[in-house]
Each structure stands twice: as C-alpha cells, then as structure tokens.
Amino acid sequence: MAGFFRRTILSDRQEAAVRKTLQNLRAQRRSRFRILACIDGTDEAFVTVRFAARFACTDDCDLIVLYVRPIDQGLNSGGLQVRLARQNMMDAGFELPGVSHLKRVLEILKEEGIDAAGWPKLTEHQDAWGDPAGDTKVEYRSPAGRSIVLKLKTAPDAASGILDQYELGPYNLMILGEPSRWRGEFNAFFDAGIVQSVTTMAPCSVLVARQSLARQGFFICTDGTSRSMQAVRRAAVLAHMTQEPITLFSAATTEQGKPAAEEAVANAKALLKAMKIEVAETRTAVGKPVEEIVERGSLYKVIVVTDEGRSRLQRLLKGSTATDVVRRARTSVLDVR
C-alpha cells in the first residue's frame, strides 16, 4: 500500500522532454494575443466576456473564460455524476457549479459575432485540491487556429485561482468585473477583495470592466516617463484594433508643471503618429492627477493608466495613482503593465 502513494520519478530524458514541450507551448502562446476573462456568475460580470470578444477581434487572438469555484461545494456524494459531467462538461445533464455560467458565455460570444459552438472541441480534466470535480476545460478551435477556452477551476479562493491560472498562461490581458468592495492601502495590506488582490498582484495588464460598453474612446493618461510611453503604445494599438478614438491626457499638479504635461502628450502623439495611429484629441489639466483623470476620463469607454510596478508595501507607503483611479473611476479602467 505504501508503494501506491509513492511519487513517480521521471528519468532525466523524460523530464527534459516535458520541459521542452512546455517551452514550445509557451513560445507558441507568446506569439498570440491571449485574454483571460473572469466571471463570477452574476449578470454584471458577463461584461468581461463582451469586452474580451471585442478586444479579441482577429484570428491571432485567443480568449479564455474562467470561472473559479471553491473546493468541494458538497460534491463528495456525487462522485459518479461528477466524473460523467466533467467528461462532457457542456452537455452533461448533471451540472457542476459554474457550468451554466460557462454555457451562457457561448451565447454572449455568439451575440458578439463569435459563434464557437460549432467549432471542433476538446475537453480536458485535471485533479485539483482533492476535489471530485477538479479543473475542467473545454477548448473550441476554429479552422483558422483561433482558440476559445471555457475553464472551470477549483481553488481555495477566487483571487488565488485567477492568479494561478496566469501561471498556466501566459496572458497579455486579464479582464475582471467591477469590485464589490475596495479597501484603502493599509486595510488591503491585510485583507483585500478579489479584484483588488488580482489587480495588485497580476503580472500582466488588467482591465477592470464596468458597464461602459455604450461609451466611446480610450482616455490614455501619460506622465511622460518611458514606462508611461510604453503603456501609451500598447493601449493605442488595442484602441486602434477596436476602432476606438484616442484621447491623450496628462495632469500637472501645479501651473508650473503644465508645460511638462503638454510636452508629455505631444511626445505621446508623436510616438503614435510614427506608428500611423491617429489621435483624436490631446488634453491637459492642472490639479490632483487622480481627481482630474477620474472626472474627465469617466465619460469614455476606457481610462488607461500606467501601473507603477510597486509592491503592496510600496503602495502602502507611497500610494498608487493607477490603483486609486481603478478604485474611483465610474468607467472601465485598463491598468497597463
């Protein structure tokens, strides 16, 4: 019996083959634009899927929709039904928690012009956390090689499940729904909500999606730094691909700083001109940056801010303009990394 639980040891040759397979898979994924859209089952959260569908508008974009459920959820008594359901997650009569929400995703994607239900599909399952259901995904692949994945993931909590999913990626963009609560930096250091935790810790850019799809335009903020200019470039490409007008904005804290703000937007406009991306408008303002960005940018579909790359402790000590905008904005906010 002791031998039954003994860990399987791979030979050096087998380990090398596994590493090479993973490296090839990651290299292949890096050549594509991959979006991870997270849902929690509420009607409001499906806005993440609509945003993802509109951003993933070409065949070199892949879309993964994730639903994270807590461990177990009382499924221990239904082992046989669970095994049958996970083998054919989208068609089984017995529904795992979250499956109905993933079925709704297919309907929303069809409404957005992506009819993946008729594509060839592959179902995969992995054991996780000793849970009867584990992790299950259904991948739909178009003839052009485009991938739509519906993933049901088991995790101790939603935030850790989402961040763990990134490690299985990588992803270029995560899309989360509007937070139900957002704590100050001090309280968040000890107890942050799901969206706040993921936004703070995610290695890639994060869009916090609010009900702003009916609005138009990307309100892209810059302070003139090289990090900010990289964010301008990335956000502008996304805006250009989705045919959204671009407004460049910079805020100065004093009148003396206004020339620097004007120079920042002028340099950003020149950068985009070199990329053959048109800028609809440039704007500057004097005041507290967060207040100016939130007040002026909330009329647009998306506010774009540059993440400062600060740790939780650094955010506690120094604060974060990007985090404050995400928290206070009345529209969707793209935090670019």
Regions found by a protein language model. Name each.
Residues 268-270, 286-297:
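A short, acidic, amphipathic alpha-helical segment used as a generic capping/interface helix at domain edges
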Residues 1-23, 45-51, 56, 152-214, ...:
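Gly/Ser-rich helix-loop-strand patches that form or flank binding pockets
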Residues 11-14, 21-95, 106, 110, ...:
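Small/aliphatic-rich secondary-structure junction motif
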Residues 147-149, 205, 278-281, 332:
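Conserved beta-strand segments of alpha/beta enzyme cores
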Residues 45, 159, 228, 290-291:
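Short, well-ordered alpha-helical microsegments
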Residues 73, 126, 183, 216, ...:
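Generic structural signal for helix capping and beta-alpha/helix-loop junctions
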Residues 120-136, 140-161, 285-290:
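Charged docking surfaces used in two-component/phosphorelay signaling
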